[in-house]
Structure formats: C-alpha cells, structure tokens
Amino acid sequence: MKRALISVSDKTNLVDFAKGLVQNGYEIISTGGTKKTLDEAGVKTISVEEVTNFPEILDGRVKTLNPYIHGGLLAKRDDLEHMATLEKLNIKPIDLVCVNLYPFKQTIEKPDVTTEEAIENIDIGGPSLLRAASKNYQDVTVVTDKNDYDLVLKEIAEKGNTTLETRAKLAAKVFRATAAYDAVIANYLTKQVGLEDPEKLTLTYDLKEKMRYGENSHQKAWLYEDAIPKSFSILQAHQLHGKKLSYNNIKDADEALRCIREFQDEPTVVAMKHMNPCGIGRGDTLEEAWDRAYEADSVSIFGGVIALNRKVDLATAKKMHKIFLEIIIAPGFDDDALEVLEKKKNIRLLKLDFSKENEPTRPEIVSVMGGILQQEQDTLVENTDDWKVVTNAQPTEAQLKTMMFALKAVKHTKSNAIVVANDERTLGVGAGQPNRIDSAKIAIKHAGDAIDDRAVLSSDAFFPFNDCVEYAAKHGIKAIVQPGGSIRDKDSIEIADKYGVAMVFTGYRHFRH
C-alpha cells in the first residue's frame, strides 16, 4: 500500500483530496488539526507518532523531523542500498506529500502583530517535508497548492501514479514556494533589526496575470504583485468598467498615482501621458480642477490617464466623457457619474482607497543588465521655510505657493524637466530633453500667452548655465524655483537680478529617469 503524508494549514478541499487518495489505495499519515479534520470526515488516518514512535515535543515545534519520515521520503527507490536500509530500520516509503505552510505572511499583515507571534508562525517541519519530497521527485509526488489536487488525483486514477513530468513540475513549484516563504521571513526579520543594506537581497512577488503583451506587441509580459501588497497601488484598484489594463496602462496609472499623492489639500486632477504629466489642475471643486487640467494641454490629454483625488461627480464626468481617455482612477464615482462614463465601452474606470495614500513607501527597483538598482522613493516633502531666496527680488506669498505646486509637478516629470505653472494649473511641461534649455523652451512655448505675473518656472535640477533664466525672463517669467548647486549659480543669479526675477534655491534635486 502506498503512503501519503498530509499536513495543511489551509484545509480547502482537503477531505475530498484525501478521500480520493484512499480510494486509489493510499494510506494517510497525518498530524494535528489536519488529522482531526480527516478523522471527523470519516477518512481513516494514522498519526505521525505511530510512524515515528516518538511524541510531538516543544509545544508542537517538533513533529515530523524524524528519520522515519524523512528516510521514507528521501530513499531512492532504484537504489538497492537505500531500500535495504529502509527495510533494516523498518522504515516504510512515503510516496506523496501534501503540505502547505504556516500563514506567516498573513500573520505579519495584521496591524497589531508582535514579533513573538510572527516567529511562532515560521514553519520549520513543513518546508523540510516539502524540500525532501521535492528533492526525490523521481519517486515522490509533492503537493503544496490546493489547485493541483484535481490533477494529481486524475493522473493517479488513470495511470496508478503521477507522471514524472508532473512530479518535476510540482517539485519546481515547491522550491519556488519555499524560496518565497523564506524571502518574506528574511525581509520581515531584516526590517525588524533595521538593516538597510543586507548582503543578500531576497525579493518575492506573486503572479497576478499574464499580460497580452508588453510595452510593444512583440514583447511578452507578466504582472507580479508584491508578496505583501500595498493598499495604495494600481494593483489594488477595483476595476469598475472597461477592458483589462495593458502593460503601458499600468505604468502610466502608477505614475499618475505617485503624482496625485502629492496633492491632498485641494481637489486636483492629474493627466498623465507616457509617464509625464501633460496637465495638472486644482480648484475649489473637482469640475474646476478638471477644467484646468484639460486647459493645460487639451491636445496631449487625448488618450491620457487621469487621476483625481476626489470622488467623481456628474458634472466632472460629463466633461471627461467628451474626450477619449484610457483610464480614470479616483477614490470613487457617484452613481450618475458612473452611468455617464460607462457609456464608453473601452474606458477603464478604477476605484482605489485613497485613505492609504500616506502609507510608507517601499524602495524602487530598476533592472540593469546583470543586476538591479534599488533606491528609496523620492517622497521628500519640501518646506518653504527651508528655501533660500538668492535674488534681490523677493517672492510673494502667492508665488511661493505656486512654486510649491510647480515643484510637485516637476518632481514627476522626466529629466531634464521644466514646468511652468500658475497657482491653478500647469501651463507648460518640458520633459526628457538631453539639455535643460530645450526643456525650458518647450515648457515656455506650451505655456504661450498664459504666462502672466502669476507664472513661475520650476526645474528638477540646477541650471548649468544662465541661459534658462534669461530665456524665461525674456518670456515673462517673474519667479523661478530650482535646487541650486551649480558652480555657475552666480551667473544665473546675476541674470535673474538683471531682469528683476525672484529666484529660490530649495537645496534638493528631483531627477526622474
């Protein structure tokens, strides 16, 4: 008679699986809560203690760590010495292992979890069983995912055993699962001891979906989610309407969320296009904020991704409905607003809980050939009290407020980045140019006649020469905010003084590549 060892924390479909094994001639070894569940369901089992002749000890910390278990798993059936050893020691082979692990991840997601509670949910015996069975997949079937129960039972019923191909795939799946399990534990404990730069970086993500394609149609792509999901994330958004999100949709929507998170005090609308804001507007109402974001660049917003920081009302929905948009993401939608927007078949409407927008961020990871770069996200909150006025002209309180608005916008624009804005909206965005003066020219050209005494210019990095300041001044800019720090800062200050421009140094650069 073949033997199966079953010990699971997730008991979904457990009884049916065990009954299927029994019907196909398996004897079930089990322990703890799993044994109790099976016994109550009328499935005959034998306890681990009956196999090992050794009781559970240390409050259940040691149950299956025993040669009578691991010998039965690791013995190679075609190795005469191995089998002779089993016979000599009266160890019976175990042909199938079904184990899933203590819920460590679910435990540490609890808001009030203690370190002691987390540690008690680190599984030791489970991973040992899974790894032993997987190592010997030539002879042993190993199952850790309830979604594989039917496949295993089907093959056993039809062929008397699982196929070698299936056993190999299940073994590989187990090693992925145990590696991910250990990674979550390692990351939790590393965080507990406050280590920022561990010598080994362990990352684990769960497959959320296979994408139709990647950035371009000839590229394959997959979407993976952090093993410990973040609440304020495009991956946690609830899609109310429209087609599935594409690879590019997700990237643009993610950038839109990063940007809208900067604006919390007033109704604000961010229009994102190819990872750059083409328009940001704010107002007393969401409709007013939309009008200003649209006015910022009524051409580029076509086909854009829109993030709003207030619930979408009917008036705003009617205006958004007039143009083609890829995505609208907001904290919610009034029923009548949703009804209007749903008339467009392909628009993607996403609802996300904005109450978690201030939760701590996780490091950004960028792939490079042969490795990765990791850095903290740029979540620096600027404070006007820390800024330094470097010109004779002093900025007004209104200009300082507008500078802050423009700085938040330029922070989410690809470098070299220049943003021209007034106190209500962006007027022009110059993004991604190899030199700063070209970005300035693009932003000022887009702003055009909208430049007035309220307009300010923000730069994500210092001006290497005075040309940007002079160009801006000649086109009506009265105030500039930039990090400072160039060896030629003096030249830029002199030009600003020549034209009576107020200029502020923040001391912080905001490159974005």
Curated annotation (Swiss-Prot):
Keywords of this entry: Hydrolase, Multifunctional enzyme, Purine biosynthesis, Transferase
HAMAP family xrefs: PurH
PANTHER family: BIFUNCTIONAL PURINE BIOSYNTHESIS PROTEIN ATIC, BIFUNCTIONAL PURINE BIOSYNTHESIS PROTEIN PURH
Gene3D superfamilies: 3.40.140.20, Methylglyoxal synthase-like domain
GO biological process terms held by the UniProt record: 'de novo' IMP biosynthetic process
Pfam family, any one: AICARFT_IMPCHas
MF term (GO), any: IMP cyclohydrolase activity
NCBIfam families given in the database record: PRK00881.1 (NF002049), purH (TIGR00355)
Reaction(s) catalysed (UniProt annotation): (6R)-10-formyltetrahydrofolate + 5-amino-1-(5-phospho-beta-D-ribosyl)imidazole-4-carboxamide = 5-formamido-1-(5-phospho-D-ribosyl)imidazole-4-carboxamide + (6S)-5,6,7,8-tetrahydrofolate; IMP + H2O = 5-formamido-1-(5-phospho-D-ribosyl)imidazole-4-carboxamide
Name of this chain's protein: Bifunctional purine biosynthesis protein PurH
Coiled-coil region list: none
Residues covered by the MGS-like domain: 1-144
UniProt gene name: purH
Record has Hydrolase as a keyword: yes
